Amino acid sequence: MEKYLEAALAAKHLPRFHCDKTKQKHILSKRDAIYEYDNSNTNNKINCICNSKNILIRPADFEESCFIFSTTQNYFGVSSDALLSLKYAVTEIIYPFTKNYDFYRLNYNHRFNFYPVAIVRAHSIDDIVTTINFCRKHNVPIRARGGAHAYQPASLVNFGIIIDQRPRDNIVQIDRQNKTVQIEAGALLGPIVNQLSKQNILIPFGTCVTNGLAGLTLGGGIGFSLREYGLTLDKVVDMKVVLANCQVTHANKYQNDDLFWALRGAGGGNFAVVTDFVYEYVEANWVSIFTMNFKFDDTKKVLKVWQKWAPYTNTKLTSEFDIFNKYQPVIVTGQLLPGKSAESDQKLLIKLLKPLLDLNLQTGFSIKTMSITEAAQYFGEGSYARPLFFYNQSDFNFNPLPDEAIDIIIYHMSLLDANQSHNKTEIDALGGNFSKIPSDATAFPSRSAIHWLQYTSLWDTSDQELKSIEWLKNYYKDLRPYFPKNRKYVNALDYDVPPLNALKSYYGDNLLELIKIKNKYDPSNFFKFEQSIPSFDDFD
């Protein structure tokens, strides 16, 4: 252990070491620092007996890992003294020795273990500017995080600094005259929908109430109002941003219009830190929700009808097709936007659902009229308030699925055990007004798609990871040949694909223009992650 500690203190980066907890007590010493681990302590704490040159940085559970942070060592050109002094320049900062470090270093998806040297909890735009300036000055890697709900660790970093915007989660202003609402970038979908619904305000948000508003908007925003009002990003009229040079400015159709174009569909982690969004809204008092249940054995019959009907029906109706496993019913559910009255809406909904009702295969059927908040809670019942482990893949589909593809879906979903009830194939209907927007009107390119398919594997403990991921990888491998256009949703990043191939699948023909805009606003590639848009100098 002492040899490892000595090597750790000499390392260029912040290391981890593991402690043999079979012994009751360990005394670790190096230079003039002595650390004691006492297994008899119920909190499994490390006690720093003497600490003049080295700071012990310990996550809450020492069994997993801990850091040695040397005050005599530089990391990415910045001394630990400078890192520690950052706390005097920002409102709130979390270091690895801070009590809640483990909570804040993780995202919603607990598959990913990253260890930043600091997490700045941004309570103001000044906090963001200060952090960006610090990272530029000291060449420290940086990531910006909104709701922490990303499928991949694009907002996480090892040995860098994370700007966590979740303290900034307020509705700043509702402008009744212009029918706009300004919302801070750290807001989560559930609370915001609840607040807006009380004022009869509807914005075409997504369906997962635990999602962050920023990531949802910057990548697209697929939800149950899509076929009438488009993506969430289609309702954005202004964004306040902090650029890589620390300038605070706006992006809209009058100011930095090229950046405004890029941020709508490719904005996550590529060009700037977006601090606030201004959305156009519509007024709505209620929506009508339907749910139909079918036997798993009838999946093919129902899906063949639904997939040809759902993208082309009345634009006020958006629906999705959900398959879980052979032990659970297949669910078709959706939302009809309000008309003249709730009663007339329910009658219209029954009329629109005729192609599915005529199959006479449903084992359950309900229609309910409810508020926007109630609808968000209804659709969000499948969302998880607690973090968990998950792995996703997705595809945009441009033609009805052939029988062979449907058979593959049914086969792989049938392999799941009864206790794998949260694994899911979700097919969202697109089309309508979403498809009337040109593919180059924003950075989001896949406007002619008629479905978005999302395949999800979830598990509760890390020992289930290999089995869960293997199932989905085999499933996805078999299904891939039926999506020759290879278009993916950037809000469902796929790190199994090489970066250049991934960029082409996310942005299509818009990629070259995005690289030009990247070169204009962030030529040094300060904002980056594994599959970020490169500047010209970095493009390979």
Residue ranges of predicted features:
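Soluble FAD-dependent oxygen oxidases
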Residues: E2-D540
